[in-house]
Amino acid sequence: MLTFIELLIGVVVIVGVARYIIKGYSATGVLFVGGLLLLIISAIMGHKVLPSSQASTGYSATDIVEYVKILLMSRGGDLGMMIMMLCGFAAYMTHIGANDMVVKLASKPLQYINSPYLLMIAAYFVACLMSLAVSSATGLGVLLMATLFPVMVNVGISRGAAAAICASPAAIILAPTSGDVVLAAQASEMSLIDFAFKTTLPISIAAIIGMAIAHFFWQRYLDKKEHISHEMLDVSEITTTAPAFYAILPFTPIIGVLIFDGKWGPQLHIITILVICMLIASILEFLRSFNTQKVFSGLEVAYRGMADAFANVVMLLVAAGVFAQGLSTIGFIQSLISIATSFGSASIILMLVLVILTMLAAVTTGSGNAPFYAFVEMIPKLAHSSGINPAYLTIPMLQASNLGRTLSPVSGVVVAVAGMAKISPFEVVKRTSVPVLVGLVIVIVATELMVPGTAAAVTGK
């Protein structure tokens, strides 16, 4: 009975939040209210409000406010600062003419490709490769928004389609050393090499190709439906005094991430890399003019870009975090886990149930990690009791948690991309919906075809 009540409360609040956001209310305000309401109900029901890693203040009422403080400090100080730095960097690149120079140079070879959608798919594959270097979905999204998004929009790709491309790459896991993959390999009782490269990678590649094809047709359909016209930017209209080599500057953060990964050079945080990139750009600006006042004035543009990012993106991330914690403390996720364990032992049925529940949990909470970490704990027990190969259950769940995050209007990556693109999170979700569902179907089918369903098939008995 309690499980049903917790599910009902979660669903009612989710529907209410979605309704008001769709009606045009501030997403930040609506998510804050929804999250606080869930936390208050959780406290009344006697649930612990704060995560187990945080000490209680002694009172449930102050614990609720304490959690908001925790999010403000964590998301405003680490993830939030990274987002603000990237937005400030993007604003500075526009100010000094570097983005205009990228468009001028890129437009020359691209003029031979008549379809902006082919350019969009090329950008998608590049973005997927970037996920190997940047493991954070939100971090990758904001990095792509600061670098690839302006280029895509300026060569004729609609803002919605370009935002969807920036939000999509982390939907399918490629990085073999990410925390999710390491945990999944342990749950599957396989070595990391066998699990990541021999089992998961072929499925991931198939899903990425399928999602790319789906993006091509879905974005084109939506653009036609919404009467969005594509006009390749006339580069002759772009006037900039920036030298041609400035075209490399917007991509220096990506280059820095690849170089300073601990293999080729020291391992540096993305914020450190961004500071280096800003210093390089400002020094080049000084060498062009030898006008210190002009350089300092130009940097003010970057600071204002950072301030806009705090208001439009970081606070939205904090609100989304409060909402996700509310769903967790009310028992919504645990209730979904209880439903999964109530199903029978047929491998395909159990796999589909786990995939659907993981996907729903990821969509509602906006987290890819939390649902997977919660569900994966029971995989070894379920697999052994049912005679099912653990990897057969783990791989689809692993991908479903990340795919579901891309369908969530409260996930960090969707919120960040929408905020930087200045469109609704629901617009991003609509743009990613069909490609994500195509990717999910491919993952399920590929798992059924490529991964043995029973433990006996694995051991050869």
From Swiss-Prot:
GO biological process, one term: mixed acid fermentation
Regulation: Active under anaerobic conditions.
Cross-referenced Pfam families: DcuC (PF03606)
Record note on disruption phenotype: Inactivation of the gene increases fumarate-succinate exchange and fumarate uptake by DcuA and DcuB, suggesting a preferential function of DcuC in succinate efflux during glucose fermentation. The triple mutant dcuA-dcuB-dcuC is completely devoid of C4-dicarboxylate transport (exchange and uptake) during anaerobic growth, and the bacteria are no longer capable of growth by fumarate respiration.
Reaction(s) this enzyme catalyzes, per UniProt: fumarate(in) + succinate(out) = fumarate(out) + succinate(in); fumarate(out) + 3 H(+)(out) = fumarate(in) + 3 H(+)(in)
Keywords: Antiport, Cell inner membrane, Cell membrane, Membrane, Symport, Transmembrane, Transmembrane helix, Transport
Listed transmembrane segments: 2-22, 26-46, 79-99, 116-136, 137-157, 164-184, 199-219, 240-260, 267-287, 313-333, 343-363, 436-456
Main location: membrane
Subcellular locations according to the entry: Cell inner membrane
Recorded GO MF terms: succinate:fumarate antiporter activity; symporter activity
Gene Ontology CC, one term: plasma membrane
Membrane topology reported for the UniProt record: Multi-pass membrane protein
Induction data: Expressed only under anaerobic conditions. Anaerobic induction depends mainly on the transcriptional regulator FNR. Nitrate and fumarate cause slight repression and stimulation of expression, respectively. The expression is not subject to glucose repression.
Family according to the record: Belongs to the DcuC/DcuD transporter (TC 2.A.61) family.
Biological role: Responsible for the transport of C4-dicarboxylates during anaerobic growth. Catalyzes the uptake of fumarate coupled to the export of succinate. Can also catalyze the uptake of fumarate and the efflux of succinate, without exchange. Shows low rates of transport, which are sufficient for succinate export during fermentation but not for fumarate-succinate exchange in fumarate respiration, indicating that it may function in vivo as the succinate efflux carrier for glucose fermentation, even if it is also able to operate as a fumarate-succinate antiporter.
PANTHER family: ANAEROBIC C4-DICARBOXYLATE TRANSPORTER DCUC-RELATED
UniProt protein name: Anaerobic C4-dicarboxylate transporter DcuC
